[in-house]
Amino acid sequence: MLACLPGPGDLSLQLLSHTQMNTGLQKWDTTQKMRTAHYPTPAELDAYAKKVANNPLTIKIFPNSVKVPQRKHVRRTVNGLDTSAQRYSPYPTQAATKAGLLAIVKVPAKSILKDFDGTRARFLPEAIMNPPVAPYATVAPSTLAHPQAQALARQQALQHAQTLAHAPPQTLQHPQGIPPPQALSHPQSLQQPQGLGHPQQMAQTQGLVHPQALTHQGLQHPPNPLLHGGRKMPDSDAPPNVTVSTSTIPLSMAATLQHSQPPDLSSIVHQINQFCQTRAGISTTSVCEGQIANPSPISRSLLINASTRVSTHSVPTPMPSCVVNPMEHTHAATAALPAAGPVNLPTGISRAPTGYPSDLKPVTWNQHQLAHLQQMCSEAGGTPAPGLTGKHTAGRELAGPGFVGKAAAYPQELCLAQSFHLKPPLEKPTPSPPVNGLPAPLAYPNGHYFQPLWNNILPTPNSDSSGSQDLTMPFHGGQPTGAPLDCGAAPGAHYRAGTGGGPVASQNSLMQTVDYLSGDFQQACFREQSLAMLSKAHRAPGTRAPDPTDSRSLHIQHPGYR
């Protein structure tokens, strides 16, 4: 054996070099194979995916243990990428943990993939084969910032304004803060001579507006092109500190307000007051109302007082024009609209509230009652006395231009459909004018609906039922209980077909009145103090002293808003 071996000098070198070389190569090769096979780097995976992308279908299963993803794991994947652990990695967690499944599907020419169930999905091969470096893919900018979208919206707004070109003074101008696409509310008029429906009937009502109203608005007010714009602004575009309502500040007045400085509440009230005073002489119905449909977190009481101060001090209440001509009463409405919201004109004589509570079925009036109301409206056209404290010479005569007498309270409420007016609290109550010429309660055609008043004293809002003083606002003298409910119900509640006289009937009438409230103000003072009011409504006749629980004081203490 020794003869077969090489020389002693070369033996150790050859054996050592061979063994070291052999073992070293084997260890290095095994390590290299393990690194490439079991631990592929993301760069290698990316290169492999690009290399195999042209093959129809290539699946490579790494030799390590592969776990089949269960349903709960599949639900946590987005486009095959696990979103549970490594959220921002463009590669699956199986590849990151050196084990898993890699499948590359060849992209068809049309970039449409058919799923197993037959559904199709379109995708972009560039975005799939080249995952983004950033944590998230670059998203297209917001659609609100696209100039093309804004230009398209402006074109639509212009086209929409051109379709309404038959009423040029009503062209909508977008105030600040309102994007053009959301401000396409139809301009409409509140004057609907024949009861054409709610103001929500946009396009139908638009073509039926009284033509004289449009001419009056276009001639007398050239600087105000928005006399009665869309009555409702979208709720989604309004800041949380702006009251969006259907009646407080119309879109027309909002467009004419000054935008150079931040709007102050007093300046807004002043501008609205001027607007109402200029609008008071027009033959159309004014848009200044003492009503807030959707009060916002900004100082509700301030806004209520501000809006009602406008409707209270803008113009003294004129004589109801329905006394002279019942069919033209809509042209002589005062600066305060009924707080019952949108109204219908059933026959041009009376207006009934249109929105009823869901738990109360509206009682429809028959023709007999309407005939009574028309007769009352026609009989109330007596000659008004010169002074406010003039006595009634006849049962149907009026007491003065600013004071509505006992008989005239009903026709004015019938014809003008004026409900209560929210007023700021006065420092001292206004004495009511005495009427001493009424020996007994007069019989009305529908007199069984009303209770007689107190002893020759006509109660007025915020009055102590004593003395006489000038009065600028109408009052409700004929409530169902005889009580001067200043936060009274809608006008239709006074004329419900109902029960006869007596305390029980009065209580029923009051409860019906409470349930019949349909405006945007639900009178909480009724429900809170109903028992006290019922007990005081049927006291013995006599001069009443101001009571802290009276409905007038209640109205001051509890401004009735939802």
Curated annotation (Swiss-Prot):
Region (Disordered) residue spans: 147-242, 537-562
Compositionally skewed regions (Low complexity) per UniProt: 147-167, 183-201
UniProt cross-references to InterPro entries, sorted A to Z: FAM222
Gene Ontology cellular component terms for the protein in this record: nucleoplasm
A matching Pfam family: FAM222A
PANTHER family per UniProt: PROTEIN FAM222A-RELATED, PROTEIN FAM222B
Family note: Belongs to the FAM222 family.
This protein's name: Protein FAM222B
Lineage: Eukaryota, Metazoa, Chordata, Craniata, Vertebrata
